[in-house]
């Protein structure tokens, strides 16, 4: 791409905007990132000038954006894969000083910044990925906790720092993939913050969100207090992903460790679901106990009312018998009125008796349901205990495999040292052998010279002997 001089010396707003965009994306347009097996390849393209052309160029902006998206996706693949492998080999909880983890956050920051629209403020234009991350709490209620925690952190003063803290807390919560998927699925909300061809708006964003699921096997712990997240410079270190020709192959047992970790994560997830079920059942049991208490109180009130009605009935019977005796001599109409009052009292007593029977039946039903819930709780607690025992066993197996791995690595290192020593000894022996062979050749040559001299002396002696005779 050729660089042309602008027609005027004074920069225009359009010139500043294009120059700023070129400055931010030069690291992506300068190289093409591709995958060679599991290694990174960087292919340098033509030089790119930061001074824009006044005339339309032949470069397609959509092609450049697609190239940037592909580069970022490949970098994210390498970063996530390298982080998982190194974390499993390390075998401990990761902290903020771990280099592969730092590079992962840098790559994620570049992915979130790609195609981000600039917001106009009093100080100029500002690009921050904190705005899209704030939307997650509206889509996933569980994210409200980490958003509130980020806002409460005292040392954060810029939106960039808050976004970086949010990414770290989401990774600690093992929900980063879930949050990113929920955010990417809402393109209509993201369009307020991103350009149409940004990474978060295209298929590459969904692929990266799917790759983040693998990070749920990593345990990370970050201390946000005192860490300067506002002024950190996010530069991708390509040297971590370039192929080393002398790199050694992974030691034996990595497959078994991966299988054990998968089983461990499965058991932990199952244990979490069982705990949630136990909590739900406990809530239902509490509600049933409250309902049972209420029904017991209602039953006691009904019993008291029945006793009162029985007393009233006895009193009414006594009064009726008295009235019958007294009214035998009275008018017939009075006896009819007393009979109606007695029938109404009997009807009222029958209704109260039926109400008592219904309340007792409901109480028996609630008691049986409570017994069933208690039995289900006991079975679930037993299942949880068994799963926890299995989890402990799997962790023990994982520790044994790690110890075996370290032992094999130590033996391999010792054997490599022995082979190296033997190779050095062999080279020294070969050197001595060559020296001895050269000495033997010199001795053979000297022997030949001596034989030749002896023959010469013999012939000379033979010639001298006849002369003396």
UniProtKB/Swiss-Prot annotation:
Origin organism of this chain? Mus musculus
**Record's function text:** ARL8 effector that promotes the coupling of endolysosomes to dynein-dynactin for retrograde transport along microtubules. Acts by binding both GTP-bound ARL8 and dynein-dynactin. In nonneuronal cells, promotes concentration of endolysosomes in the juxtanuclear area. In hippocampal neurons, drives retrograde transport of endolysosomes from the axon to the soma. Plays a role in the generation of neuronal polarity formation and axon growth. Implicated in the formation of a single axon by developing neurons.
Pfam families per UniProt:
RUN
Query: What's an example GO cellular component term for this entry?
Result: dendrite
Q: Which residues carry this modification: Phosphoserine?
A: 34, 49
- GO terms for biological process? actin filament organization; cell differentiation; negative regulation of axonogenesis; nervous system development; positive regulation of axon extension; positive regulation of axonogenesis; positive regulation of cell migration; positive regulation of intracellular protein transport
Give me the stretches of Basic and acidic residues compositional bias. Answer: 321-337
Q: What CDD domains does the database record attribute to this sequence?
A: RUN_RUFY3
Q: Where is this region: Disordered?
A: 321-342
Report whether Ligase shows up as a keyword of the record.
no
Q: What is the gene name?
A: Rufy3
Q: Which PROSITE patterns match?
A: RUN (PS50826)
User: What's noted about post-translational modification?
Assistant: Phosphorylated by PAK1. Isoform 1 is partially phosphorylated.
Q: In which tissues is it expressed?
A: Expressed in brain (at protein level).
Q: What is known of its domains?
A: The second coiled coil domain is involved in the interaction with GTP-bound ARL8B.
Q: Where is the RUN domain?
A: 95-227
* Protein name per the record: Protein RUFY3
The compartments listed are:
Cytoplasm; Endomembrane system; Cell projection, Invadopodium; Cell projection, Growth cone
